[in-house]
Amino acid sequence: VSKVRVLPLGGLGEIGKNMTVVEHDGRIVVVDVGLRFPTPEMVGIDLVLPDFSYLRERASDIEAIVVTHGHEDHLGALPWVLRELGATQMPPVYGGALTIAMARSKLDEHKLKEVELNEVEDGEELELGPFTLELVHMTHSIPDASAVALGTELGTVLVTGDYKFDQTPVDGPPADVSRLAELGREGVLLLCGDSTNVDRDGFSPSESVVGPHLEEAFARCEGRIVVTSFASNIHRVQQVVDAAAALDRKVSLVGRSMRKNVGIGRTLGHIEVPDGMLVGPREINDFPDERVVIISTGSQGEPLSALRRMAYRDHRQVELREGDTVVFSATPIPGNERAVNETIDRLYHIGCDVVTPRDAPVHASGHGYAEEIKLMLNLVKPRYVMPFHGDFKRLRLHAQLAEAVGIAPENTYQGENGLPLDIDERGARFGSPEQSGMIFVDGVEIGEMADVALRDRRMLSADGIFIIVVTIAEQDGRSMAEPEVIFRGVPFLDEADELIEEIRSTVEDTIERAAKDRITETDVVQDMLHDDMAKLVYDRLKRRPMVLPVVVEV
């Protein structure tokens, strides 16, 4: 019996790290390979990837990786995934022109040269094993965004990627509504649709409304202007450049990813900058304040981003000062609100004026609102619906919208990462869960991280560490030297000498008790020391630093 399996490995029940496995006749196409950024609780973690163990075991069955667009939550994990899969067989990668250019740049950074990268024109049909592949042009906050239509014997699996129905886009034509309708008439088996803004009524504003409001905001500013947005939001960068040109201001790009993406955008003709307008960050001070616009990364409060460093006066090239205006031309991704608010607060402390989308229409979402999601459902008329790209609340709301436009509730499947949807001629049903979850990137290391490791990092960052080194006799467990007490990062330790003496006294009492009870095993003695020290430190400080006893036998 012919069967199609759709297995989301990321992007359901969360915002970010989108990754979907579509399987048919024993062959696999992977749609998107995204990452997400760590929450504040993930201390020391740089990036979070989907757990792609399922793909590692099936590497030789993968026909291709197809990427809907060039945002990090859809493309960012590509180097790590390819490096892991390449040991068996390096799958080819397909996407639009800008998407492939960004993929190439990312792979070059990771020194991955032996990857087959294929640009696909909208409407072009390719054969990938038992699948046909077509990219359908969509509008989003980045050029060359596409929906992925995978044809199978049972019908088309349509993964929308991120989209909105923008009738007046700033770059290129509107979404290919006629092709979506044609696919609907031909037979869409399953629609996997973007749920990001399902909780917002009506239609999303067009990207083209942002430009005039940016120019209006710029005209009110007498000092320097810093605009922060996603580095991949090529359309927004163009509108900032246009607004700056209208007011005869120079533009400087700050942030490595901003410079890289703008360079790619200019090469492909998506960004046009007048000659002599761009200046380097070190040249900003050569011009009067009223003639400078800085376009910076950091709209999400990322710890190492350019704007965050400016806000904390830690940027080597740009020093913000009173009278500067910072325009947030982006809204926080769910989960980033705290980091963004902290950045804004630091900017106010410096004396900057801050403009956010709450103050003026300086941002338009790249994701369609509820009426656009209804339009997608009505255009493609899918047999089955599986909401994608959202937390569980948004997935539920998307399912309710599907029912509202006439799709039977039993044909709408609210899934989660790792839960495959199996479809054959008899119907659709969830299969047995597959391994899914998070893979952490910590510096150059990549792998799973146990909850205990993250808990230890949180404990160290919040309350510090005490290390107690004791030397005991191998024969009878007696103390052979005065205990050594070392502490780092322990807050509010005003009377350190007094506490250290108390710790030493308690340690000696514990060692004496262990020797008296003929306990000489070092691991048991360490446990006794840990319990006694942790209790003492909590009683004195009302905090729980990590306590690490070290027992040396002589």
What residue spans do the PLM features occupy?
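C-terminal tails and terminal domains of large nucleic-acid-associated
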Residues: 518-554
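Broad gene-expression machinery/nucleic-acid interaction feature
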Residues: 130, 145-147, 463-467, 547-549
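Conserved hydrophobic residues forming the short capping helix/wall of the S-adenosyl-L-methionine
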Residues: 107, 402, 537
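Short Gly/Ser/Thr- and Asp/Glu-enriched loop/turn motifs at secondary-structure junctions
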Residues: 121, 416, 543-547
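Solvent-exposed loop and beta-edge segments used for protein-protein assembly and interaction
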Residues: 14, 142, 288, 460-462, ...
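Short glycine-rich phosphate-binding loop at a beta-alpha junction
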Residues: 92-94, 386, 551
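Hard-cation-handling environments
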Residues: 199-329, 333-358, 362-518, 526
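His/Asp/Glu-rich metal-coordinating catalytic cores
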Residues: 1-66, 71-286, 305-319, 338-342
